[in-house]
């Protein structure tokens, strides 16, 4: 898998099907997006994520993430993606207009995008799926729900973890929650 930071990007020659998102925790909803990307055989398979997480950029240390960028890289590599694009989320990136963000996607040679129903982009989240549909084929899967009919989200997973309800967190993660770290003694 090629890992490419957008600020070091040159034009991609391969046509790609691209999932875009923060993918913090890579829960069942994220996994559905990734499966859809992998189902297309007419393109290379790619993911665009952000580092730091946009909420961490805006909120600072108040925003906690489930995955580090290293964890995401490892996961997408294990899933057999051809490309992982990383947008360094800083003041410049946050200021991109809708048209500037679309221009970045065109540099990636995107044939098809796979995004969640509530995907927003561009300065102050001014762009939406309709803006993307003007330029690309866009696939938007149905929102996945938990057994309790709650929308599966990283926020819900964090809530369950904070409550100590790891069993419920695991159900919507689709795997056992774990923490990576160094043990000192």
Regions found by a protein language model. Give the residues of each.
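Nucleotidyltransferase catalytic core that binds NTPs
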Residues: 1-185
């Amino acid at each position: 898998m090629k890992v490419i930071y957008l600020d070091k990007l040159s034009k991609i020659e391969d046509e790609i099907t691209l999932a875009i998102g923060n993918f913090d925790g890579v829960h069942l909803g994220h996994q559905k997006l990734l499966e859809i990307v992998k189902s297309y055989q007419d393109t290379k398979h790619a993911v665009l994520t952000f580092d730091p997480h946009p909420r961490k950029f805006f909120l600072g240390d108040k925003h906690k993430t489930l995955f580090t960028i290293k964890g995401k890289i490892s996961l997408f590599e294990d899933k057999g993606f051809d490309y992982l694009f990383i947008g360094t989320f800083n003041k410049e990136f946050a200021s991109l207009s809708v048209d500037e963000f679309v221009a970045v996607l065109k540099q990636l040679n995107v044939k098809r995008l796979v995004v969640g129903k509530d995907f927003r982009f561009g300065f102050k989240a001014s762009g939406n799926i309709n803006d993307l549909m003007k330029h690309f084929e866009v696939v938007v899967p149905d929102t996945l729900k938990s057994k309790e009919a709650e929308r599966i989200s990283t926020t819900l997973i964090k809530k369950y973890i904070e409550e100590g309800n790891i069993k419920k967190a695991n159900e919507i993660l689709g795997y056992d929650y774990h923490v990576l770290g160094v043990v000192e003694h």
